[in-house]
From Swiss-Prot:
InterPro entries: UPF0145_dom_sf, UPF0145_YbjQ-like. It comes from the Archaea. Belongs to the UPF0145 family. It holds the Pfam family YbjQ_1. This is UPF0145 protein MmarC6_1828. It comes from Methanococcus maripaludis (strain C6 / ATCC BAA-1332).
């Protein structure tokens, strides 16, 4: 399935718009990560534990959006966006959304 942040594919024409698809996950911080993060704020630098959690969360939200698009019979998802928002103290929602479409002359370009 092709996925892009653009509103269309230069190489292909959209035949039918199937509607909004989304995927999300809510994650909470780990008390061990908080301790490490607190120490890192003293010396500065990246907090790799949180970076990994953020990457995994975005990937999970993307996979869930992808699966919803597949269930709808989409060939592609255009206009893909990511958002993050705080839900409760210490937890955040990672959201990925876009527009599922059917393409004329579907050619697979990128995402597997």
């Amino acid at each position: 399935m092709n996925i892009t942040t653009q509103d269309k594919f230069e190489e292909m024409e959209i035949e039918k718009t199937l509607g909004l698809v989304r995927g999300s996950t809510i994650r909470t911080k780990n008390i061990g990560y908080d301790l490490i993060a607190s120490l890192r704020t003293i010396v500065g630098g990246e907090i790799p534990e949180y970076t990994k959690m953020m990457d995994e969360s975005r990937e999970e939200a993307l996979k869930r959006m992808y699966r919803e698009a597949q269930r709808r019979g989409a060939d592609a998802v255009v206009g893909v966006r990511f958002e993050t928002s705080s839900i409760l103290a210490g937890s955040a929602e990672f959201l990925c959304y876009g527009t599922a479409v059917k393409l004329k002359n579907n050619i697979q370009l990128n995402f597997k």
